[in-house]
Amino acid sequence: HLADLCVRNKQYDRARELLQLSLQKRPDLIRELPIIAQACMAQGNFDRANELFSDYLDRVDGAERAYYDDITFIGSEGEIAAYAATANREERREFLRRFWTGRDAVPATPVNERLLEHYRRVWVAWNRYGEHQSPWDRRGEIYIRYGEPDYRARSDEIDFVKSADMRVQRVKERLALGLYGSEFVINVSSLHQGPVYPVRGTGQSPQIVAAGGSSQVPWESWIYFGLGGGIEVTFT
């Protein structure tokens, strides 16, 4: 969707303009609502984003709504079990109300920004990482858990400028130190473009490709600076 591409490129006004034109012609459209909501969130208009997401979720079927209500990737074991034990829709709604109230970082505002962020993450997981696996692949799961990564690279698309960011290098060097020892870090610290954790080759070859190498296996690597001193998640 062109408007989604605009949102990804931070062209929020353009995204809203495109979608408002579509909705003027077809008020019955609902797939555009979460995209407008994301543009509103990025511009700080959480009230409008809340209206749009609420309208969207009220109009989708129960199976789709269930993905947005699911707390599997964000709740504790006890919370997940308690939610699964709810007997009916009313109990589930009350449980979710209390669950999200407890996670509202700014309770003084009329909108629960963390809940909106969850809706945004689920939408992204479904629409960007569900092409080969329904409703989404492992990237979608991690995205729902942790949100937008601070850095990402793919085997066919490495941003050499961003990969030189000292924050990226510090995370990679710390992880490499734990995996391979200080000698490895000293020798190849300038080559940390690929994943630190080894990616195995295909076929009969036991080849293992580490940071800075090449691989026949497509991979995608995400880094989160603020988790556990910095973590890297690699998908193959």
Predicted regions and their residues:
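Scaffold/interface architecture of coatomer-like assemblies
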Residues: 1-236
